């Protein structure tokens, strides 16, 4: 009797266990299928630009499963994509492939190989109806500005060196200290204010430190006066003064399309047309669920142990669940962005200019820069009887330029192209408009404080979150810097700890216009960052060189 009762109890326990397990499976799936207990992916990566795809490729090569979510339904590459229109290709923003990091240079070669071309570099500045070589050539500038204006520029420069603005905070103060007030007004003020839509007094000196710190008057004079010698090693070429650069045969998007295919071949997913609407963090498992809206508004969920985000920081903070503190939300809403659009004009080949691009320092036209895509790569233009120009206009999303009809913008571009003497409006046979929201994170007086607040909130509330790239970090990174942040983030994931400080990439502002190709090693950026209680940002303590 006792043994029979024991048997009944065991059968009852087994039945209850079966019912509970079945119920759990119906509600939550098997334990191994539960995204919070066993994420399907090592990382969910938001954005298929240079940062997102570099991280995906690095992790995939190490056998890790990843999924990349890209909002664009057609192109990968982000701002580094190539847009095609009737066989003509447009580089959104212009991308010279030249890096201080040897590893980045090698990675480009690994991805594209023989499809990387070596192209001549040529840029000019348009000022008062005259074209000046860029970087400036002193003797040319002397002859074109005139003796009197040149003398005033020299006096202004000497005065700035003798009495510099102490502790320059704004872009204007920084540039005046380096070049003098007169050269600032001639060659910096108009174009910079077009780009940012704000006074140079309101732009942080950080922008100047990143973009032009290596471009000094002395360097320009030395480059103009000394005979040029072809360097034995490409590593020794200073980027500001380079004569050539590498470029994908069909534009920068060719690089990232090839990279996406490599990720897929290694077992990763790269999904287009997925707009992320929520990023949910589970503190118990330290895992992430990312919700994206796909075709026809259908919501999909993607699960991963880590989240790598290159989406705009403002957007990420608003989408994180559980909700971040109000201080972080307010700081995120205070971050600003500058948008731009490219008017692509196809015109008959008559008096084509040979430069890669020309900066338009003329307040009488709205265009900021004009690109000649045939000078980037002849294969960007399918018909040799035509040329293709890209006119760049800087604006804010929703303003008058942004909302103009495409036909009106094309007419404006043709008119202004003729106005600056780069082509005849009558020669324009076709055109298109490409709009790029959030192209540039704005460096205003308060951006560092806001980024610091956000970083502290994310560090306190969100483990396994990695910010990479230009908009992901609200940091004006060039393409190669975005790639380096992604490589370091991927290596932190592989190491299981934050060994590398992605925030130290480009922190000193030395690289963007003063780097030497391939001179640094990416892997040397050790990370030991701690919050600085006396400031609104982190204080990185680094060791080694940075890529």
Task: Describe the function of each predicted region.
Residues 54, 152-155, 159-281, 285-288, ...:
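Active-site/ligand-binding neighborhood in enzyme catalytic cores
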Residues 60-82:
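Glycine-rich FAD pyrophosphate-binding loop
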Residues 294, 304-306, 310-484, 491-504:
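C-terminal segments that line or cap access tunnels to active or ligand-binding sites in enzymes
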């Amino acid at each position: 009797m006792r043994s029979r009762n024991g048997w009944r109890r065991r059968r009852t326990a087994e039945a209850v266990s079966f019912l509970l397990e079945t119920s759990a499976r119906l509600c939550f799936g098997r334990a191994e299928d539960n995204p919070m207990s066993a994420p399907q992916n090592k990382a969910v990566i938001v954005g298929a630009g240079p940062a997102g795809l570099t991280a995906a490729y690095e992790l995939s090569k190490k056998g890790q499963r990843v999924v990349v979510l890209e909002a664009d339904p057609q192109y990968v590459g982000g701002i580094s994509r190539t847009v095609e229109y009737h066989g003509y290709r447009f580089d959104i923003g212009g991308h010279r492939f030249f890096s201080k990091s040897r590893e980045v240079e090698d990675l480009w070669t690994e991805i594209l190989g023989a499809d990387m071309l070596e192209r001549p570099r040529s840029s000019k500045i348009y000022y008062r109806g005259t074209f000046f070589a860029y970087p400036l050539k002193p003797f040319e500038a002397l002859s074109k500005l005139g003796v009197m204006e040149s003398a005033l520029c020299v006096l202004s420069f000497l005065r700035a060196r003798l009495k510099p603005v102490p502790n320059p905070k704004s872009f204007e103060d920084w540039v005046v200290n380096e070049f003098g007030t007169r050269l600032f007004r001639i060659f910096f003020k108009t174009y910079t204010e077009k780009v940012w839509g704000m006074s140079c007094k309101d732009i942080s000196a950080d922008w100047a430190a990143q973009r032009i710190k290596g471009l000094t008057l002395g360097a320009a004079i030395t480059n103009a006066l000394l005979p040029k010698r072809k360097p034995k090693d490409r590593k020794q070429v200073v980027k500001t003064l380079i004569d050539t650069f590498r470029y994908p045969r069909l534009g920068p998007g060719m690089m990232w399309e090839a990279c996406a295919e490599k990720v897929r071949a290694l077992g990763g997913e790269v999904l287009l047309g997925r707009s992320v609407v929520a990023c949910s963090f589970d503190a118990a498992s330290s895992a992430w669920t990312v919700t994206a809206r796909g075709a026809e508004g259908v919501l999909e969920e993607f699960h991963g142990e880590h989240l790598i985000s290159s989406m705009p920081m403002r957007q990420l903070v608003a989408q994180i669940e559980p909700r971040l503190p109000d201080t972080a939300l307010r700081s995120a809403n205070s971050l600003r962005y500058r948008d731009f659009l490219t008017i692509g004009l196809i015109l008959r080949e008559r008096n084509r200019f040979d430069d890669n691009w020309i900066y338009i320092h003329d307040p009488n036209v709205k265009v900021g820069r004009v690109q000649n895509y045939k000078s980037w790569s002849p294969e960007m233009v399918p018909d040799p009887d035509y040329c293709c120009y890209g006119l760049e206009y800087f604006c804010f999303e929703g303003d008058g330029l942004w909302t103009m009809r495409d036909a009106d913008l094309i007419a404006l571009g043709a008119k202004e192209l003729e106005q600056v003497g780069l082509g005849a409006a009558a020669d324009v046979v076709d055109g298109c408009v490409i709009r790029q929201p959030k192209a540039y994170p704005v460096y205003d007086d308060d951006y560092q404080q806001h980024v610091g607040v956000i970083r502290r909130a994310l560090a306190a509330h969100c483990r396994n979150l990695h910010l990479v790239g230009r908009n992901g970090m609200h940091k004006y990174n060039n393409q190669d810097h975005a790639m380096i942040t992604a490589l370091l983030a991927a290596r932190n994931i592989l190491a299981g700890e934050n060994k590398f400080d992605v925030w130290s990439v480009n922190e000193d502002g030395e690289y963007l216009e003063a780097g030497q190709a391939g001179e640094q090693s990416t892997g040397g950026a050790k990370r030991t960052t701690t919050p600085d209680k006396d400031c609104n940002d982190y204080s990185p303590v680094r060791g080694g060189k940075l890529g």
